[in-house]
Amino acid sequence: MSVIAGVSGAVGAHKYSQEQIVAHFAKIVSPLGKDAAIIDRIHTATEIKFRNLALPLDAYADLGGFGAANDQFIRIGLDLGASVILAALNQAGLKGEDVDFVMATSVTGLATPSLEARLMPVLGLRPDVKRVPIFGLGCVAGAAGIARVHDYLLGHPDDVAVLLSVELCSLTLQSDDRSMANIVASGLFGDGAAAVVMVGERRAAAMGIHGPRVISSQSRMYPDTEAIMGWDIGGSGFRIVLSASVSEVITQYLASDVTAFLGNHGLKITDIKQWVSHTGGPKVLHAIEESLNLHEGELETSWRSLAESGNLSSASVLHILRDILEGRGVEKPKSGTPGLLLAMGPGFCSELVLLEW
């Protein structure tokens, strides 16, 4: 097993109400006001109250092409990435020189050398640290990242590993895209980063770390779903692909996947005492609640995160994990009880991670 020793999250520096963002977005993508009513209706339906952005609202109209946006992704992503990793290491009682393995994920910008490579001198990482940058997992990458770091630590029980997520979704804005997918996505996504520090079993015992234990994980790809979520990448950057059938796939498959996965560990859905679910959006959260027959309030932390920050892609589920561990608006889980962390993303796919609090 592996142990979660620290979790930290951060959001973009510029906070706006959903109403402010809606009004500004409408001016950019529909300057003549033809789509203003539908933009307002769809963005209001997200149930989001606030979002934090990487840049001031006025900067987006003059951002220019993909190159300029990606430059901002690297600049701001490095600042956010450094802050969350240092905070998570501090929680764990560790320093940069203690880190043996770093996995970094983002689907909202590109960097070569990758972000974690550029952060090495800032964080004080050793030159022999193992690095695994990831692109393409999207919203599922927070859960999948914890699962893959866990896999690594099973084979390296004395090691310290860091998972970094940086998602600056607003920088992918396509001002000429009046598609329903772009209107919906622009009303959902916010900007943020998160880091998780995990340690192997022997390292946890030696340091006396008693955080949540990662017990097991399950990855699942769903047939004939490649076209329902992702990017159409072209000269202008990342153009959103997003189908209304996402919630239908969740309804069709999630309950059987969760039931089988938990059954392999002698558990049932009703045994899970704390759910750590990616936010998605209202339709996604409703689909999860209905398919798993969850009681009102069991995804309260996810709903609150969605309202306060929007969907932060891969960072969302990590922010929710942090909120639960810190008892933000929710009772901290009792030691020894089971929890399930889950997320979905492009593929279309899901990742389930069994925790013991």
Kindly give the residue locations of the regions a language model identified.
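Condensing-enzyme catalytic core mediating Claisen C-C bond formation in acyl metabolism
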Residues: M1-R75, S175-Q252, S256-A260, M344, ...
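Conserved beta-ketoacyl condensing-enzyme motif
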Residues: D40, T46-G136, I269-L285
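Short, well-ordered amphipathic alpha-helical segments that serve as non-catalytic structural scaffolds
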Residues: I76-A92, L115, A193, V249-N264, ...
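Claisen-condensing/thiolase-fold acyl-transfer catalytic domains that form or cleave C-C bonds
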Residues: A82, V107-T108, P121, R126-D128, ...
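Phosphate/pyrophosphate-binding loops at sites that engage ATP/ADP/AMP, CoA/4′-phosphopantetheine
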Residues: V84-V99, A205-M207, S256-K273, L292, ...
